[in-house]
């Protein structure tokens, strides 16, 4: 499983293990899966959709940055 951390300036939005995450990148949406290669990307207005073992959730964002490293996806967002 991929570890996901979504952080806003005022709070931790989500932290947990997920199967996949789809992000609104500035050059198009992209999906991060378990054992993804390291990457840093800016995000634009849209939805972050993440799939857990028991279902799917989404978070609307205005902008942000995402980094994948060592099977951890850290996302800093403006909500």
Can you say where each PLM-predicted feature lies in the sequence?
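Compact, glycine-rich, soluble single-domain proteins
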Residues: 2-79
């Amino acid at each position: 499983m991929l570890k996901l951390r979504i952080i806003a300036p005022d709070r931790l939005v989500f932290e947990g293990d997920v199967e996949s995450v789809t992000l609104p990148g500035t050059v198009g949406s992209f999906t991060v899966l378990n054992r993804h290669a390291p990457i840093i990307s800016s995000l634009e207005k849209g939805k972050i959709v993440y799939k857990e073992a028991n279902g799917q959730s989404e978070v609307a964002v205005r902008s942000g940055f995402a980094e994948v490293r060592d099977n951890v996806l850290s996302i800093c967002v403006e909500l």
